[in-house]
C-alpha cells in the first residue's frame, strides 16, 4: 500500500473496554492488503467518509492490534480521546469506508532474534504489544507482557491475552492496576496494585539477556525506561513508541547525552561533509538562506522562525505534516544540501538524507526538495 490512500471498509466495530474500541477493516480491493510486522501502524484520513462531521479531514495514526498471521483484514484499537479518535468512536459505523495508508513504522518486534522479550505497556499503549503477543505465541520464544492501567474498566484485551498465554509456558502476562479493588486481585483481573516498580520487575523477570519494548504515555515511558536502565538493560536493547511529544528518554535515566542542538544532521549523513557553497549563502544580516528547490523559492531564515515546517508554510508552501512534534514522520523531506539541528529529538530518525521539518532548524544555508 505504501504512501497511496486506499479504501477499507469497516467490517466490525467492537468495544474492548470502557474507553477503547476496535475497528476491523477489510480492503475494498483485495489487492491492497499487505502483510504487516507486529508493532506497525496504519495512517487514516478521517472525515472524507462523513463530510458533515469535520470541517477538514484529519490524519491520524493507529497501531495494528491484531495478529500479523491473519490475512485480508486489519484491526486497530482506538481510545476515545482527541478529535480523530472521538470521530471514529461516534461517527464511523460498520459499512463505512475509510481512507488508509500503511502499514508502516520501525517499532517492530525483532522476529529474527531468539532473546527473551519484555513487553511493557501503559493504557492504550498495549495495542502493538497484543499484536506482538500473537506473533510470539507459536514461536516458543520466552516473553513477559507487563501491562499497567487505571482499573478493570479500562483494561482492554485481558481475555484475549489470557487465551494466548494459556497452555503456552513460554508466555507470561502480568497486569498492574493503579486503582485496583480487592475483587480485581481476588479474581485475577490484575496481579498487582499501584505502579510498575523495580521490585516488581525483579520479582517477575529471571536474570537473562532481554530485549524490551515499551509503549505508553510519556510519564509511563520515562519511568519504565529508567527502571530498565537501572536493572542493567542496555539502551540498544530497548525499543519504544509513544503517542505524545518526542522526548529523549535517556534523560530520565540520568544519562549524560549531547543535547539535540549539538547533533547536526548532514544532507547525506556522511562522515566527510561537502564543501559549503560560496555564493548567496547568507542574506543581509548574516541569516542563512533556505532554498526550496522544487518550488524555485529561497528566503532568509530569521531568529524568530521556529522550525522549517512553519517557515515553509509562511513561504506559501504546503508540505505534508500531522503531529508537528517529531513523532509521525509525515513531514520527512529530502535535504539536498546543508545541515540542520533538531530542537526536539525525533521519535524515529528519518531516512538517510532526509529531515523532519517540524522540529528542525538550519545550521546554515540549506536546500530542501520541496
Question: Predicted segment positions?
Answer:
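FNR/FR-type flavoprotein reductase catalytic core
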Residues: 83-291
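Short proline/glycine-enriched turn/loop segments at secondary-structure junctions
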Residues: 229, 345-349, 357-359
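Ferredoxin-reductase
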Residues: 1-97, 149-151, 162, 178-180
Amino acid at each position: 500500500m505504501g504512501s497511496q490512500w486506499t479504501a477499507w471498509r469497516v467490517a466490525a466495530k467492537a468495544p474492548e473496554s470502557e474507553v477503547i474500541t476496535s475497528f476491523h477493516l477489510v480492503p475494498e480491493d483485495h489487492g491492497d492488503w499487505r502483510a504487516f510486522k507486529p508493532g506497525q501502524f496504519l495512517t487514516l484520513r478521517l472525515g472524507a467518509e462523513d463530510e458533515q462531521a469535520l470541517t477538514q479531514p484529519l490524519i491520524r495514526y493507529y497501531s495494528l492490534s491484531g495478529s500479523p498471521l491473519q490475512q485480508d483484514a486489519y484491526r486497530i484499537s482506538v481510545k476515545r480521546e482527541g478529535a480523530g479518535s472521538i470521530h471514529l468512536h461516534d461517527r464511523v459505523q460498520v459499512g463505512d469506508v475509510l481512507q488508509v495508508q500503511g502499514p508502516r513504522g520501525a517499532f517492530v518486534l525483532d522476529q529474527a532474534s531468539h532473546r527473551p522479550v519484555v513487553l511493557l505497556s501503559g493504557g492504550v499503549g498495549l495495542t502493538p504489544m497484543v499484536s506482538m503477543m500473537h506473533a510470539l505465541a507459536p514461536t516458543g520464544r520466552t516473553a513477559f507482557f507487563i501491562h499497567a492501567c487505571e482499573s478493570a474498566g479500562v483494561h482492554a484485551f485481558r481475555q484475549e491475552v489470557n487465551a494466548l498465554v494459556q497452555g503456552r509456558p513460554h508466555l507470561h502476562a502480568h497486569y498492574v492496576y493503579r486503582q485496583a479493588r480487592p475483587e480485581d486481585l481476588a479474581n485475577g483481573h490484575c496481579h498487582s496494585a499501584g505502579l510498575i516498580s523495580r521490585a516488581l520487575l525483579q520479582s517477575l523477570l529471571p536474570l537473562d539477556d532481554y530485549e524490551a519494548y515499551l509503549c505508553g504515555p510519556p510519564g509511563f515511558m520515562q519511568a519504565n525506561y529508567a527502571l530498565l536502565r537501572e536493572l542493567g538493560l542496555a539502551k540498544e536493547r530497548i525499543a519504544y513508541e509513544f503517542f505524545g511529544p518526542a522526548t529523549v528518554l535517556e534523560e530520565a535515566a540520568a544519562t549524560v547525552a549531547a543535547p539535540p542542538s549539538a547533533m547536526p544532521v548532514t544532507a547525506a549523513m556522511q562522515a566527510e561533509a561537502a564543501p559549503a557553497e560560496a555564493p548567496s549563502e547568507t542574506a543581509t544580516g548574516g541569516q542563512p538562506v533556505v532554498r526550496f528547490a522544487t518550488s524555485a523559492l529561497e528566503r532568509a531564515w530569521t531568529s524568530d522562525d521556529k522550525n522549517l515546517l512553519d517557515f515553509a508554510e509562511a513561504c506559501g508552501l504546503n508540505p505534508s505534516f500531522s503531529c508537528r512534534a517529531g513523532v509521525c514522520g509525515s513531514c520527512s523531506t529530502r535535504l539536498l544540501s546543508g545541515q540542520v539541528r533538531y530542537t526536539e529529538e525525533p521519535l524515529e530518525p528519518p531516512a538517510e538524507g532526509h529531515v523532519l521539518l517540524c522540529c528542525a532548524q538550519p545550521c546554515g544555508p540549506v536546500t530542501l526538495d520541496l
